[in-house]
Amino acid sequence: MTIKKEIKNLFLQKRFSEIIFLIESKFEEKTPEILNILAISRLSQQRSREIYKQSLSEFEEAYLKDKNSQDGLNALMNYLNAAADLDDYLGHQDTSNFSKFFLDQSVKFFKEAENKFGYNPKLILLGIRIFKRLNQLDTILIYYKKLFDKNDLNLLTFTSWIFFNNYKTYWNQKDYFKFTKLLDLHIPNIPNEKLINLSKKKNDKIKIGFLSSDINKSHSITFFLKTICAYYNKKE
């Protein structure tokens, strides 16, 4: 069995630590394909600030080694995804700007690849992930429009495009009506027999739900919930 076949089998079995050891011990010169596998294996095995840094370095090396090939493009798309994931991993509470360098590099590489490869919906969606984390709203809307013009929006990305237009005044009420109606084309039809009947039974319990992307101990909603639970009198 060749080393590449062995790596493939290990990857299918998700034995990532063995892949990392095998590549680091057997490959003195690593191709873009091997660098891609190595970096993916690192991130699949463990997530940390240093692991992200090392994996991003390997994705970058793979891209720079062969910018014009599919392997190079794959490495770049992995770089964009990992850079966005790193920013999410560190969270808003991180003030070191550690991820900012990788986000800025992502923009540079994205523009470069777009000029080289032309329209690529997967590349654009990953670019949008980066632009969101850099708060580049106008750029986000430009690329969502490109996807719309090519009929490459799905339900999730279509609703995201509508949502981000709320922060601008480009659309009027007719535009919102027009595009929200188009959502019907992306919503699956659910047969009646698969629908769940909602209970109409009433009781004295009050049920309250809160939805937030970042509820934590210092979040304002947490203090609100504490006061509700502490002082609520169900007899009144």
Model-derived regions: residue spans:
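Alpha-helical solenoid repeat scaffolds of the TPR/TPR-like class and their adjacent stem/linker regions
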Residues: M1-E236
